Swiss-Prot record:
It comes from Pisum sativum. Reversibly glycosylated by UDP-glucose, UDP-xylose and UDP-galactose, but not UDP-mannose. It catalyses: UDP-beta-L-arabinofuranose = UDP-beta-L-arabinopyranose. The gene is UPTG. The lineage of its organism: Eukaryota, Viridiplantae, Streptophyta, Embryophyta, Tracheophyta. Homopentamer or homohexamer. A motif (DXD motif) lies at residues 103-105. Its cofactor is Mn(2+); Mg(2+). Its main location: secreted. The record marks 151, 158 as: Required for activity. This is Probable UDP-arabinopyranose mutase 1. GO terms for cellular component: cytosol; extracellular region; Golgi apparatus; plasmodesma. Keywords: Cell junction, Cell wall, Cell wall biogenesis/degradation, Cellulose biosynthesis, Glycoprotein, Golgi apparatus, Isomerase, Secreted. Glycans are attached at residue 151. PANTHER family: ALPHA-1,4-GLUCAN-PROTEIN SYNTHASE, UDP-ARABINOSE MUTASE.
């Protein structure tokens, strides 16, 4: 008896799964029921001569550092090395509307009833339903089945806005900074909160890249994970840097960012002493970085993500460059990233090609 064909999953031909890695991707076996019909973009970090083994049956393309250098040329300098921030190269070369990115130490979680959670499906539902950043709904996501807008919610805002980002959570190993890891080495996250909420306009959040989905067409050019890792004075701030940038831009352009479901199972705790070395400067710098982003505003001329990001890069150079020369280098890399994005995506815009030569140079 012939087996029935597998049902086509949501957005099968409109979504890429991006995975940064330095090891064989055996973890994909657990995700096979949910990922097998999607296209994978694997960004190999570290030694490009190492062969990364991918389980049979997956449709994928794999890029190592040699590929990144070949494709981007001198602009490859904006892509981090020996850091999971390299994943953003996968965002750049994707041709799909949506991206889901996951770390290779993350596995399928189970809900309180024992059922395996299809994290990707929940992310897609989050992205395809509107967000409510301008007025908080006390029943959280009003578009989920079994809920609605509460009494007193303005009818003029009930249509919502497009969702740009879906930020998922994790069970087991929490995403803590090194000092918290050191004082709570045995703590595990066992709380499953069945909720999705929109992060209000004007509020920042610490974005984690291990279980993250976004609309690439809406916010992709701003989803840059910065300069981290090899040769840089800081690490483990890549996803948070991107999160602060995209939140300022989403607030300006009128897009929404959701957090909550879905959960994944985070299996491996990283070394807190290694993490402390990576985070040390960032722990101090963030006390100035956060107020910078809280106060950041973009001009009315910023009508595209690229324009927003270029303007934000100039503010980074001007206001954070006084903290450390690293931020001047980072601001330049932000411009390089946008230029590379537009070149790769055949969308070379006038504002990105002219800015580096004139406006940004004038701020040096």
């Amino acid at each position: 008896m012939a087996s029935l064909p597998k049902p086509t999953p949501l957005l099968k031909d409109e979504l890429d799964i991006v995975i940064p890695t330095i090891r064989n991707l055996d973890f994909l076996e657990m995700w096979r029921p949910f990922f097998e019909q999607y296209h994978l973009i694997i960004v190999q970090d570290g030694d490009p001569s190492k062969v990364i083994k991918v389980p049979e049956g997956f449709d994928y393309e794999l890029y190592n550092r040699n590929d990144i250098n070949r494709i981007l040329g001198p602009k490859a300098s904006c892509i981090s090395f020996k850091d999971s921030a390299c994943r953003c190269f996968g965002y750049m070369v994707s041709k799909k509307k949506y991206i889901y990115t996951i770390d290779d130490d993350c596995f399928v979680a189970k809900d309180p009833t024992g059922h395996e959670i299809n994290a990707l499906e929940q992310h897609i539902k989050n992205l395809l339903s509107p967000s409510t950043p301008f007025f908080f709904n006390t029943l959280y996501d009003p578009y989920r089945e079994g809920t609605d807008f509460v009494r007193g919610y303005p009818f003029s805002l009930r249509e919502g806005v497009p969702t740009a980002v879906s930020h998922g959570l994790w069970l087991n190993i929490p995403d803590y900074d090194a000092p918290t890891q050191l004082v709570k080495p045995h703590e595990r996250n066992t709380r499953f909160v069945d909720a999705v909420l929109t992060i209000p306009k004007g509020s920042l959040f610490p974005m984690c890249g291990m279980n993250l989905a976004f609309n690439r067409e809406l916010i992709g050019p701003a989803m840059y994970f910065g300069l981290m890792g090899d040769g840089q004075p800081i690490g483990r701030y890549d996803d948070m840097w991107a999160g602060w940038c995209i939140k300022v831009i989403c607030d300006h352009l009128g897009y929404g960012v959701k957090t909550g479901l879905p959960y994944i199972w985070h299996s491996k705790a990283s070394n807190p002493f290694v993490n402390l070395k990576k985070e040390y400067k960032g722990i101090f710098w963030q006390e100035e970085i956060i107020p910078f982003f809280q106060a950041a505003t973009l001009s009315k001329d910023c009508t595209s993500v690229q324009k927003c990001y270029i303007e934000l890069s100039k503010q980074v150079k001007e206001k954070l460059g006084t903290i450390d020369p690293y931020f001047i280098k980072l601001a330049d890399a932000m411009v390089t990233w946008v230029e590379a994005w537009d070149e790769i995506n055949n969308n070379k815009s006038e504002e990105t090609t002219s800015t580096k030569a004139s406006e940004v140079a004038a701020t040096k």
